[in-house]
Structures are given as structure tokens and as C-alpha cells.
Amino acid sequence: MAAVVLPPTAASQREGHTEGGELVNELLKSWLKGLVTFEDVAVEFTQEEWALLDPAQRTLYRDVMLENCRNLASLGNQVDKPRLISQLEQEDKVMTEERGILSGTCPDVENPFKAKGLTPKLHVFRKEQSRNMKMERNHLGATLNECNQCFKVFSTKSSLTRHRKIHTGERPYGCSECGKSYSSRSYLAVHKRIHNGEKPYECNDCGKTFSSRSYLTVHKRIHNGEKPYECSDCGKTFSNSSYLRPHLRIHTGEKPYKCNQCFREFRTQSIFTRHKRVHTGEGHYVCNQCGKAFGTRSSLSSHYSIHTGEYPYECHDCGRTFRRRSNLTQHIRTHTGEKPYTCNECGKSFTNSFSLTIHRRIHNGEKSYECSDCGKSFNVLSSVKKHMRTHTGKKPYECNYCGKSFTSNSYLSVHTRMHNRQM
């Protein structure tokens, strides 16, 4: 006779589920208890370091450390609190009374705080409603401070208040020295150190000092080699997000900084600022052989090699030499076949960003550079300059071997190779 297996009843399913859930919880607690100690997650400050923190940073520290205490206590760990925690608990109580937040022991969860020094007062349910923000604390003590415009969540109410000024544009804290304004008092305090020269944050490795903790954090990556910001196109990494942003423009071809006088475009503001000196005459570096002026000393040094014939950068594959290291880097790609710059329109790839920028003008029909003599237009500044020499007869590039002159450097380079083959 075949055996008949009866399905479990709903009651037995609930009972089994409850017993199984309790067993899993106990196993997890036992496992986590052996892996995590409070020392693993605790952060200690000296009195001097504590004095440097602003109220928002102290609030964040208090919330994080108290939450760590709660979570570890719920696992049954014996927690030895840092010396600041008792002070923070007292501050938490005072802040609760001052803000008028309704507090009470949570009725839904049994008190898990049996560890040394922890009391049921820490496990509370708080709720505060206002016109622009909402704050709730759940059973684990996690804080929800959500911006009602972008829905970004912050760990403290003060952080949310400071964040909302991004949307409103409010900058109530002005510098009395230069008039620059900021959205928070702490940002203004950091800015004022520019005027008074105060640099309280010192690197333990090299002794260099900084006006803000964030600058020190970025600087330390020089010593430890940390580069957390990675380019998704080529994999190159950077120690600072501000370095990654202009690098990404190499791949996209974006050049947001445009000169109003010569219409040249630039990827970064620093290069654009140096370029403007060419027009204003500020900080000019003038070649004493041809009188040509440059915005930086390095550009002038590179230019001198035209007159001296010096090509210090040599390709190990073919022996070809170059005046600039960047030119050698681009040339090496002709051997490796690497073309990291791709056109989004047609998929064509190029060895350098400049070629990609010029190529894109084929798609949009842009020819920004016009000859003032004949009206012919070009999509590259160097092309219109070269073309205008057909009208002026100017030939600024002279061969050091035979004295012959040329309208462009590329023509001179081709001509120079003829002498090199004869030697």
C-alpha cells in the first residue's frame, strides 16, 4: 500500500517558520559576535582633535558611535565605550530636551541593551515633522533625513539643513575680507584660513600642512598611492575627483573654455587662464630669436627646440625623435595601434583627443576659423594660420642646415629629414 504524505497545516508552517527564523538569528548573532568587536569599528579623538570638529561633525560622530553600540549590544557583545561616548550620551539627552522631540521606549522590541554601561534609554523611537524635512528613527537607531527635492538621505538633521541650501542658493555666511559667501559657517571658517594663513592639519609623513582636513586626506594619497577615482573609458586612476573630470574631457572631446579673441577652446580652466596671457601680455615669455611670445615658460622652452633643432624624446621602436614628450606618447600609439579616442557619431577612433575634436567638426559642419583676406574658412586654427601665410609670404620656420624657410613646422620637419638621411 502506497504511503500518503499529507501537506503541513498552516499552523505547523508558522511554527516551523518561527523556530527556523529564531535559529537563524541565533546562528547569525553567534557568528557575528566572534567576528566583530567594538574596537574594530570605534574611532577615537584626542581632545585637541575633538575641539577642531564643528557641531555637524560632532553630531555625525555621536550618531555613528551610538548606533555601533546599539548594534553590537544587540549581538550580546560586552561593549567598553570610548571615553567620549558617555559625554555624547549626555549631549544626546540634552539635545532631545532642547529640540522638544517626543521620546519613549519602543513598545515593539524587547530591550536588547544588557551590555555593560548601556541602558534602555538609548533605544527610543523619535519622530519629528516640519515643513521641509522628515526625520524618523527605526528600531536600529538609523536616522532618515530626506531632502524633499532630490530625495538624498543624510545621517543628521543639520547635514540635511546645510544640504538644502544647495537648492535654495542661500549663502548667509560672508567673508569680511573678500566678500565671498558660503552656505555653512564651517565652510566660511575653512575659507578664512586662506587670509590668516592658518593650516592646522599636518601630514605625518612629510610635515606639509593644510587648511582643511579634506585637503590633507587627498594629499595623503600621494604617500599611500591610493587612487580611488577611475576613468571608465581607459582605466586611468586619480587621487582626486577634480583631476578625473578634466581627464574625461579627453575622451568626450569637450572643451568648455573658449577664448573670445582667437576662438581657441580648452579642456581646463587653468590652461585657458595661461592662454589668455598671450592676449593680455601678462606674464609673457618671449623668444629672443624670433620674438614669439608664450604664456608659460615650459611652452617657450619647447619652442626653443625649433631654433636649436633639439629633439630630446626618441622612439625606441623606430628611432624617430620629438620635441615634446606628449608628441612621442602619441607617436608610440602608431606602433601599438592604440586609438583610445572614439567618435560617438560614426565610431571612428583616433590616437589623440585633438584629432577627435577636429574630426567631429566634419559631422557638425563647423568651420570656425575664417581668413580675413579671402574669406576661406577652416575647422582648425592652425590651418587658417598656415593659409594666411600664403597672403603675407611669411615663412617663420628656417632650416639650420641650409637656411631654407617654410610656412609651417610640418614642412620644415619633412625637409629636415632629407638632411638627416644625407648625413
UniProtKB/Swiss-Prot annotation:
Thylakoid found in the keyword field: no
GO molecular function: DNA-binding transcription factor activity, RNA polymerase II-specific; RNA polymerase II transcription regulatory region sequence-specific DNA binding; zinc ion binding
Highest taxon of the lineage: Eukaryota
This protein's UniProt keywords: DNA-binding, Metal-binding, Nucleus, Repeat, Transcription, Transcription regulation, Zinc, Zinc-finger
Gene Ontology, cellular component aspect: nucleus
Main location group: nucleus
Entries under Pfam families matching the protein: KRAB, zf-C2H2, zf-H2C2_2
Keyword Transcription belongs to the record: yes
GO biological process, one term: regulation of transcription by RNA polymerase II
Zinc finger feature spans (C2H2-type): 145-167, 173-195, 201-223, 229-251, 257-279, 285-307, 313-335, 341-363, 369-391, 397-419
Gene3D superfamilies assigned: 6.10.140.140, Classic Zinc Finger
Family: Belongs to the krueppel C2H2-type zinc-finger protein family.
Free-text function comment from the UniProt entry: May be involved in transcriptional regulation.
Protein name in the entry: Zinc finger protein 557
Organism encoding this protein: Homo sapiens
Originating gene: ZNF557
